[in-house]
Amino acid sequence: MKIKVINPNTTLAMTKGIEHAAKSAARSDTQIVAVSPKMGPASIESYYDEYLSIPGVIEEIKKGEEEGVDAFVIACWGDPGLHAAREVTDKPVVGIAESSVYLASMLAARFSVVTVLPRIKTMLEDLVDSYGMQKRVLNIRTTPMGVLDFERDPEAGIEMLRQEGKRAVEEDNAEAILLGCAGMAEFADSLEKELGVPVIDGVVAGVKFAETIVDLGKKTSKLKTYKYPEKKEYVGALENFGRNQTTTK
Amino acid sequence: MKIKVINPNTTLAMTKGIEHAAKSAARSDTQIVAVSPKMGPASIESYYDEYLSIPGVIEEIKKGEEEGVDAFVIACWGDPGLHAAREVTDKPVVGIAESSVYLASMLAARFSVVTVLPRIKTMLEDLVDSYGMQKRVLNIRTTPMGVLDFERDPEAGIEMLRQEGKRAVEEDNAEAILLGCAGMAEFADSLEKELGVPVIDGVVAGVKFAETIVDLGKKTSKLKTYKYPEKKEYVGALENFGRNQTTTK
Amino acid sequence: MKIKVINPNTTLAMTKGIEHAAKSAARSDTQIVAVSPKMGPASIESYYDEYLSIPGVIEEIKKGEEEGVDAFVIACWGDPGLHAAREVTDKPVVGIAESSVYLASMLAARFSVVTVLPRIKTMLEDLVDSYGMQKRVLNIRTTPMGVLDFERDPEAGIEMLRQEGKRAVEEDNAEAILLGCAGMAEFADSLEKELGVPVIDGVVAGVKFAETIVDLGKKTSKLKTYKYPEKKEYVGALENFGRNQTTTK
Amino acid sequence: MKIKVINPNTTLAMTKGIEHAAKSAARSDTQIVAVSPKMGPASIESYYDEYLSIPGVIEEIKKGEEEGVDAFVIACWGDPGLHAAREVTDKPVVGIAESSVYLASMLAARFSVVTVLPRIKTMLEDLVDSYGMQKRVLNIRTTPMGVLDFERDPEAGIEMLRQEGKRAVEEDNAEAILLGCAGMAEFADSLEKELGVPVIDGVVAGVKFAETIVDLGKKTSKLKTYKYPEKKEYVGALENFGRNQTTTK
Amino acid sequence: MKIKVINPNTTLAMTKGIEHAAKSAARSDTQIVAVSPKMGPASIESYYDEYLSIPGVIEEIKKGEEEGVDAFVIACWGDPGLHAAREVTDKPVVGIAESSVYLASMLAARFSVVTVLPRIKTMLEDLVDSYGMQKRVLNIRTTPMGVLDFERDPEAGIEMLRQEGKRAVEEDNAEAILLGCAGMAEFADSLEKELGVPVIDGVVAGVKFAETIVDLGKKTSKLKTYKYPEKKEYVGALENFGRNQTTTK
Amino acid sequence: MKIKVINPNTTLAMTKGIEHAAKSAARSDTQIVAVSPKMGPASIESYYDEYLSIPGVIEEIKKGEEEGVDAFVIACWGDPGLHAAREVTDKPVVGIAESSVYLASMLAARFSVVTVLPRIKTMLEDLVDSYGMQKRVLNIRTTPMGVLDFERDPEAGIEMLRQEGKRAVEEDNAEAILLGCAGMAEFADSLEKELGVPVIDGVVAGVKFAETIVDLGKKTSKLKTYKYPEKKEYVGALENFGRNQTTTK
């Protein structure tokens, strides 16, 4: 099967890392295609970045339909555009935050998230609440490092995660740690060994969940919420989004 | 004061209607500027449309900074891009859904929303929950009519709203009716008379709340969640969003 | 328009302060009438005081009907008698706690309240929950000072608010501060400057929301919950409450 | 022991009925004193009536302190003034709504309330939510009959309860029925036989819970929320409430 | 009346202590029968122990039917098997955790639980949530001592409870303390004196609630959730559970 | 890998069906071992049956440790003993209800469950709530058929599911249907075709999730809630549960 992993930001070095993580988790007969959108931000660290990454994500989903993709993974821990992505295709689409919390809840009774800048705490709190996980998530721990700081200085990154992960275990009593950014996959194994609790990277979780749903032959429900978008005109820089739509009408 | 009312869709006839409603509610010394974005969908009836309307909305917010705008109203009942808009400016930004539910809760103990197509019910449920109104909102009633159907055939529109409004009062015991689309302002008064309960149009509510916040001299908190976006590169059709940013760095 | 601001306690010096705050926020064509009830407690710092302030509040609402009042503001951060007030008049009635949390949620993603004695914490927690704001309110911070202590010793008062406000910002990560007592209006501006986040006084918020609702021509829904009280006999010291009622029968 | 049962309304015929129910449930060595306040409404059917009944209720609690009362029952299904009552005495105070829902939840997984006029539905919904029973209470069923209609025409009353009780069992799948008014005790037994599920009258539940708490030697916590009210001046018709207070200072 | 108090663990010394507490609280005309099951764990400190205690508890409930028991108390602070117990008998069954939280909520606005090992915190959190008490319970405080450590070394036990109880009052602002284990009854009185807030032992609370429900002549609803189990075959070590069932068929 | 699928009831014909479904979903290199416990009920249709199935389930988990099992699936839609199972092994254990709701929430915005007898509705409601799915699950639809009726008369079974599934789609607007019993796998495909929405059988979902977690090399967190049970004596018919324990001490 073919799974398209979309890194919603446009930093290709990070996409490479995500691709690596995805391939290491995928089955040998699963083809991983990892991409960044053709438009959007270099990293996602605010509502602004998140919303502006979505057009590019949707475009990649739409292209995926023609590319014979069987399932999609949105590889950013805000799950940007997830619900819209489910509208434009009937192939399964999973987010890495979503996959992380569901996976974690099958391994641990309570857990914490460790992520990037403090400003995204509210965004992630509301996200995990939307997945019904408010009681299970003990804390969203942020760091002073941005998304690309983890790319640029992985040593500082792992040190920061180690520190916050330890505090999550000791102060929150977190029974698992969720890495709240798609660029942290490489740190998961060593952290897990050090911390002694499951450390969950969303990219690998998302890829495996995508494989699972394809194996089960399931597709997104097209009954109501996730029907194909209504056909209509789009103008300006986003004009193409109104064209060649697979739509309900 | 100058209030910019942004109709997130690109249907100018609808923007005209919104402008008319906004002006009729604004104080004589309030200048209303009603616009549609330069890019995006002709109407918003799905997550797809909603997310794709946001870049255009943000662009209008940013332009507003240079235009000397004192406050912004996002005039679509999904409040698209509201949190991002609060990041790019320190001027108050209010959504019409948000304004509607807060206003309604000061007039009625329980209420229902009447809106467009069934597919957006989930979206609106999650939205009113995010405002803490899950207990007060009895029902989100949808109609078979799309956003622009109400523009094209106002007579059918009012008839549909009358019918669902009546059922909201009789079956839900709704003590107020919220019109769940920016293009329904013109119907509010006659519906209110017929139904005997407050009928709330979000555009006028949003404009008045915006005036109030400006009068109070309040600005959006820039401490954490709504800080200016981090400065970074944007590529492709959205390249401009990385340029000339008012940012934290 | 004429807005009656009811300070539910009987301390006229405090009513003067509230009147001053209300007038400073009101439009020039808005007439502010600030009163204390003819019966009740000198301050409200318990359920006991709160409930016993309500008969006096209701009396003032009823009188307001004859005085040509267009809207009412209940100026105590427990919103005492708010729902009953909405029964005895069809003019809009807003509470200052209610107004504060709705206003704050349009300016900040998360916030804390700073108020008087520790014993009222439970009362205020339950109140903000009833407005659906449990997720947004990070903390109700109390001080060892009572309501009238803030009147008697404003210097100690501002110092106390400064201290708790600072802890709210630093420890709670509050993005706005709500002053949880009607007698704190005078401190709002200097606190806002010092703390660097919106500081919200409920009296001015309430007055502006009242103006807004009158401007919109909206009245309280009389369909069900807020119908006029059933006509019936009242005895004893409250005998008058059964007389000359505007009632449903 | 001596239990004072306070019917918060001033209709003595109803107080008699409540006294009868209380005595029939009390142990032989429990002395029941049933009273109505000296001031307030003839019945409670709105927020207005509810709040205006509270001063009279509090007065009776305070008198009870001198009368050697061991525990108090507030015998109206809105539990008016319950939290204030717990402030003015350290003797246990229980409400009949509170007692009913806790008792019911030890007998049935899900249940419905049958009560008087439609207008009080919101009030009772918010009340049962405040006791954490939102998931257990399936429905608050109202009837077109007021409180005193049940006194005046018990035959119509029982018929109405039978009808709504039956619908609660058949349509809501209620596994117990709670009689949502203090004047319905006399109907409980025959309804229980007919409906085949527990039918709970709050007055007898409240009296037995009060006995239990006295037996256990427990008193209301005076640490924080329920401390004695702060000593202060009261004016006007409620002047006495500031006098001879048992207070914290 | 005859109340059977079931200590779900098989440590008879602890059952003796529970019997003592139960008898000290029961009325003189109440016969207390305290037992341990014939099978199961020596103490309950995990989901494992809890579930494995349930067959023994159910067996004791069933025997109670023949022994002329009027009501049952399940004396472990996890309320093991409570819902199943309500299926196999129509006599009232109360759990001591359930009784504790309902009793506490009639005495205090907010409270904390002090219990045994850290590992059961999740279990107790989910339990109090299931009783709707998430807002009232401020904290579940655990200790490094197991259930039988409190039996073996009561002096260390009381010291531990004193310490955590004090922190509950000072740090959580708990207005009552709930002893989260059936073997702590003996410590309740002295702790209450020291801490100055109600200290609630579940065994005595459960016994008194059981007496109350018997006095009221109420039985468990057999309409739906708590119907007698369906008759069916059981095999292996639990074979007897399929025999001589009082069942619906 | 080796996955042990435990049908918690002792009806081997049903275990065969579950094995068939599991094998059809498993990868070719996954070995499925499907068993029924050596003790317990022939079917699970009450709290009684559910709790009494748990000792047998736990025994099978423990045996699995010696059998070289890599992961466990508990194949009953009440997920009996799930938390205890996670204590006795560090291999992943998933429940089929849990798997179903997480899978469904990646395919559909809102869904309903169709299951056996009405009496288990409360049990399943509380279960899906414990997974945070209260907002997504629109309805738990029951049928007059018991678990084994579906085995005995599959034609009546499919007809019943078809009927309730249709009502779920039409009346609840369910966008997916969850089959709320392990014995319904065989009906899933034809129902999905007829109803036009995803129809989810928990057994196949559980098996695939188990494979995924094994692939990811993840194990249950042993930090706190799911630590191995404390070592202790067990007596009577369950005596073996105290022996040869893998425990924390």
Swiss-Prot record, chains A, B, C, D, E, F:
Family per record: Belongs to the HyuE racemase family.
Domain of life: Bacteria
pH dependence: Optimum pH is 9.5.
Subunit details: Homohexamer.
Regulation: Strongly inhibited by Cu(2+) and Zn(2+). Slightly stimulated by the addition of Mn(2+) or Co(2+), but also by metal-chelating agents such as EDTA or EGTA, indicating that the enzyme is not a metalloenzyme.
Biophysicochemical property: temperature dependence: Optimum temperature is 45 degrees Celsius.
Site (Seems to be responsible for recognition and proton retrieval of D-isomers): 76
Enzyme class: isomerase
Site entry (Seems to be responsible for L-isomers recognition and racemization), positions: 181
Recorded catalytic activity of this chain's protein: a D-5-monosubstituted hydantoin = a L-5-monosubstituted hydantoin; D-5-[2-(methylsulfanyl)ethyl]hydantoin = L-5-[2-(methysulfanyl)ethyl]hydantoin; D-5-benzylhydantoin = L-5-benzylhydantoin; D-5-isopropylhydantoin = L-5-isopropylhydantoin
Keyword entries, A-Z: Amino-acid biosynthesis, Isomerase, Plasmid
GO molecular function (one): hydantoin racemase activity
Annotated protein name in UniProt: Hydantoin racemase
Enzyme Commission designation: 5.1.99.5
Keyword Zinc-finger part of the UniProt annotation: no
GO biological process per UniProt: amino acid biosynthetic process
Role played: Involved in the asymmetric conversion of racemic 5-substituted hydantoins to the corresponding L-amino acids. Catalyzes the racemization via enolization of D- and L-5-monosubstituted hydantoins. Is able to racemize 5-substituted hydantoins having aromatic or aliphatic substituents such as 5-(2-methylthioethyl)hydantoin, 5-isopropylhydantoin, 5-isobutylhydantoin and 5-benzylhydantoin.
